[in-house]
Amino acid sequence: MRSPYSLPYLLFLPLGACFPVLDTEEPVDAVGGTGREMSWMDPARGRPFPWGSPGWPRAPYPHALLVTAKELRASGKARAGFQLRLGRQDDGSEATGLLLGEAEKVGGLLGTLAEELNGYSRKKGGFSFRFGRR
């Protein structure tokens, strides 16, 4: 069972990619060093980047963010003023005629996240734009 307060952990999860990891593969220095040196590690292989730090943050499990957002909505413990619109709603637009197979082909995971952000922006009075549609 997950805690209803797991949203802050999701927000701080990408911070792990911002800090260097201690490199412990080198032997201890005879002069008195600890043998640990700060360097940026490649998360996939565990080796330092030869050119320095990566220029982009990495989200380790982007699908887990969507699943957790759906669980928070399903639990009914969303705070006042913070509600996500998961899935398409019938508002009379031309996009409601898409079949489920076509929607997955066109949207995918990133398309679904973009729709959620656009829906939240529209509710708050922000502008909206469409990717490659009309």
UniProtKB/Swiss-Prot annotation:
Name listed for the protein in its UniProt record: Orexigenic neuropeptide QRFP
Primary localization: secreted
Top-level taxonomic group: Eukaryota
In-chain residues carrying the UniProt-annotated modification Phenylalanine amide: 131
Family membership: Belongs to the RFamide neuropeptide family.
Biological function: Stimulates feeding behavior, metabolic rate and locomotor activity and increases blood pressure. May have orexigenic activity. May promote aldosterone secretion by the adrenal gland.
Cellular compartments per GO CC: extracellular region
Subunit composition and interactions: Ligand for the G-protein coupled receptor QRFPR/GPR103.
This protein's UniProt keywords: Amidation, Neuropeptide, Secreted, Signal
Record's subcellular location: Secreted
Disulfide bond sites: none
Propeptide, chain numbering: 19-88
GO molecular function: neuropeptide hormone activity; orexigenic neuropeptide QRFP receptor binding
Organism: Bos taurus
Recorded name of the encoding gene: QRFP
Tissue expression profile of the protein: Expressed in the hypothalamus.
Signal peptide: 1-18
Any Gene Ontology biological process: locomotory behavior
